[in-house]
Design a protein with these regions (language model features):
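Short loop/turn segments at strand-loop or loop-helix junctions that form parts
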Residues: 24, 76-78, 142
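Short secondary-structure boundary/capping segments within folded domains
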Residues: 10-14, 63-65
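Short, hydrophobic/glycine-enriched beta-strand segments
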Residues: 18-24
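Structured helix-beta-strand junction loops
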Residues: 15-16, 69, 104-105
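Catalytic metal-binding/acid-base residues of hydrolase active sites
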Residues: 25-26, 57, 116-117
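Glycine/proline-rich loop-helix segments at beta-alpha junctions forming the active-site rim
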Residues: 2-6, 11, 80-142
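Short, surface-exposed acidic-centric catalytic microdomains
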Residues: 29-90
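Hydrophobic/aromatic beta-strand patches that form the interior of the parallel beta-sheet core
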Residues: 20, 72-74, 111, 139
Length: 142
């Protein structure tokens, strides 16, 4: 059964963030743990670990890594109706306002983590379409 949810945690960024990576909406596991991409099947952290040759054992290490690399994380959606963690079930979507994070940082590129995030990004933030570096797919579950 789908339930209407509001995003449970804040965006992760600091004033030196240069890259913004946007997901669609947190998974059940991420909502439980209070941080982004915590579902064990999500490829987000393994991809970053491989790209940067690091091992990130916990949320504290993930956050330190993101700060060091000037990466900000947030989700396109502020609230939606969703069943479990299935992006295909999202309805009644309401977007996060990206202007606070964009005005407080040095964001130079915005990436999305999958098809749903990209679709909602384009729908809700059409004026940002020209921002370089929009990636359509990176972290879909098998």
């Amino acid at each position: 059964m789908s339930e209407f949810l509001t995003h449970p945690f804040e965006p992760f960024f600091d004033k030196d963030s240069k890259i913004l990576i946007l997901g669609s909406f947190p998974s059940v596991k991420s909502r439980q743990d209070g941080f982004y991409y915590q579902h064990p099947r999500n490829r987000f952290w393994p991809i970053l670990e491989t790209l940067f040759d690091v091992r990130l054992e916990n949320i504290t290490e993930q956050q330190a890594f993101l700060r060091k690399k000037h990466i900000a994380l947030w989700d396109v959606l502020q609230s939606c109706k969703i069943k479990n963690s299935d992006d295909k079930t999202i309805s009644y979507a309401k977007a996060n306002d990206l202007s606070p994070i964009l005005s407080q940082t040095k964001i130079q590129a915005i990436f999305t983590t999958g098809q749903s995030a990209y679709k909602f990004f384009i729908k809700f933030h059409p004026r940002l379409k020209a921002v370089r570096g929009i990636l359509k797919r990176t972290c879909n579950y098998p």
